Amino acid sequence: MKIALFGGSFDPPHNGHNSVVLEALEKLDIDKLIIMPTYINPFKQSFSADEKQRFLWVKKLWGHLPKVEICDFEIRQKRPVPSIESVKYLYKLYNPSKFYLLIGADHLEKLHLWHDFEKLNSLVEFVIANRNDIGIPKNFKDLKTNKKIASSFIRDTLNTNEVCEEIKDEVKKYYEKLQKN
């Protein structure tokens, strides 16, 4: 079985994330794309939308797609989970012959700082979703999504133009309510 893992905060999920999902399904030779929202990103101190809300948004957007599985492994841990831990969990579950790990190009600069990076690098093939024309190392796959969207911009400005239509209204209401509190 060939699998790909796309993890993230999805705070909120947006058209950039959607491009990654659709490109991965189209371009990668995989049997399953596992989308795994984090409880909290190991490199962040907090999140805006709680984990249940982010999981529901992700499930609503992509849970119905063929080959897609929405996984709550990291959320169930109730703590920051390094990628290597999620990868090992999925290896035990699926014993894949090929394992792709989808990450944003913005992570490349600090990738070597990821927990147990050498082991992680030996277990997966990195697939990079490029959003700012960042140079991709030759040993990584380039997904060529080139969507320049950041969840932080959506949260800060309440501009939901780049939020997927299916959840646009509820995302706007959710963050408006957070800003009022």
Swiss-Prot record:
CDD domains: NMNAT. InterPro entries: Cyt_trans-like, NadD/NMNAT, Rossmann-like_a/b/a_fold. It catalyses: nicotinate beta-D-ribonucleotide + ATP + H(+) = deamido-NAD(+) + diphosphate. One of its GO terms (biological process) is NAD biosynthetic process. It comes from the Bacteria. It is an enzyme of class 2 (transferase). Catalyzes the reversible adenylation of nicotinate mononucleotide (NaMN) to nicotinic acid adenine dinucleotide (NaAD). Belongs to the NadD family. This is Probable nicotinate-nucleotide adenylyltransferase. It comes from Campylobacter jejuni subsp. jejuni serotype O:2 (strain ATCC 700819 / NCTC 11168). The gene is nadD.
